[in-house]
């Protein structure tokens, strides 16, 4: 399948985890993918291994405006446009409320929410030039579940969803769609470094479909929303969590 042939995409957080799985999928379907990550070496290694042969990497701190501007300039200088943005970069913390400091709050907001804003600000300007765009933001099903011990993370991911819906309203006339995918607990490198690694069996009991989520389970929904086929869908939130959240 080559449904992204001729399309240029940026995927943040693509050195590992869900971001990398998404970038790999878009690349395998003929997109020209920029693997963007604060871990520039990791992004470069991932891009080198990508199927399709046209991937490249740019190191980027998405919480830093100058770094985000430089990323988009690099993409335009190399390929002349931007069609697809997937905001997958995130910090996944585990901090009980009584231990949550303002500095920790800001650390998470800087990456998860500020980063999404900064990436969208640069990307939308480029997409408007072409009269086409797909933005897919990775939120979380924790915003519906009220997951404890990570209030700042939940707030940041809820902000991403609300932000995306507001953008969708403003950008429809520009033929730019903005949607959110809300994964459940997913077995990634980041999760394995937190206490969440011990929660899979409990979460499985809440799921309609049994099993442990992997990055590959999230990819198809993102790829669809990033494609031309999803032109009539915007401002939506799709929980991809084996039916843990049902409404």
Describe each model-derived feature in a short phrase:
Residues 29-45:
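Conserved glycine-rich Rossmann-like NAD(P)H-binding loop of the short-chain dehydrogenase/reductase
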Residues 91, 98-118, 132, 136, ...:
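Catalytic Tyr-X3-Lys loop
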Residues 95-98, 145-151, 173-174, 210, ...:
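Active-site loop immediately N-terminal to the catalytic Tyr-X3-Lys motif
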Residues 96-97, 104-106, 191, 203:
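Substrate-binding pocket helix/loop in short-chain dehydrogenase/reductase
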Residues 120, 156, 164:
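Active-site helix of classical SDR
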Residues 125, 169-173, 231:
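Alpha-helical segment proximal to the catalytic Tyr-Lys
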Residues 140:
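Residue(s) in the substrate-gating loop at a strand-loop-helix junction
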Residues 145, 223, 234-247:
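Short C-terminal tail/terminal secondary-structure segment
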């Amino acid at each position: 399948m080559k449904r992204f042939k001729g399309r240029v995409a940026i995927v943040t957080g693509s050195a590992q985890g869900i971001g990398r799985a998404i970038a790999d999928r878009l690349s395998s379907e003929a997109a020209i993918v920029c693997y963007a990550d604060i871990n520039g070496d990791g992004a470069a290694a991932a891009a080198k291994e990508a199927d399709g042969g046209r991937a490249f990497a740019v190191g980027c701190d998405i919480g830093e405006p100058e770094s985000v501007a430089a990323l988009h300039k690099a993409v335009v200088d190399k390929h002349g446009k931007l069609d697809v943005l997937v905001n997958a970069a995130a910090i996944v913390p585990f901090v009980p409320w009584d231990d949550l400091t303002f500095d920790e709050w800001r650390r998470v907001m800087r990456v998860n929410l500020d980063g999404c804003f900064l990436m969208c600000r640069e990307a939308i300007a480029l997409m408007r030039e072409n009269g086409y765009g797909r933005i897919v933001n990775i939120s979380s099903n924790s915003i519906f579940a009220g997951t404890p011990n990570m209030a700042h993370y939940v707030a940041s991911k809820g902000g991403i969803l609300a932000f995306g819906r507001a953008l969708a309203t403003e950008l429809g006339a520009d033929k730019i769609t903005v949607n959110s995918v809300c994964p459940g607990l997913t077995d990634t490198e980041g999760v394995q470094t937190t206490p969440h690694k011990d929660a899979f069996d409990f979460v499985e009991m809440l799921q309609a479909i049994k099993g442990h989520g992997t990055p590959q389970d999230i990819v198809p929904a993102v790829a669809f929303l990033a494609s031309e086929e999803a032109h009539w869908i915007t401002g939506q939130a799709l929980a991809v969590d084996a039916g843990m959240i049902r409404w």
